[in-house]
Amino acid sequence: MHIVVCIKQFPGFGRLVSSSSGRRQLTATQPRSDPESQRGRTSSNRLTWRGALEWPRAASALDLGIFPSRR
């Protein structure tokens, strides 16, 4: 299990998640949780959704707001 140490919110782009392993992944933000993301979407959607598919557990957990270290 990966421990999320730092979460940065990018408006309309996604979340940059830095895990304890040192890897960084972009998780897609859900439209229902962040309506602003609909307007700021660009061609970088591939990278965003790729990160979401790579870390399905982390993405869903972040959307639910389980991690208290969220800034």
Swiss-Prot record:
UniProt feature, compositional bias: Polar residues: 20-32
Name of the protein in its database record: Uncharacterized 7.9 kDa protein in fixW 5'region
Domain of life per record: Bacteria
Region of interest called Disordered, as start-end residue ranges on this chain: 20-46
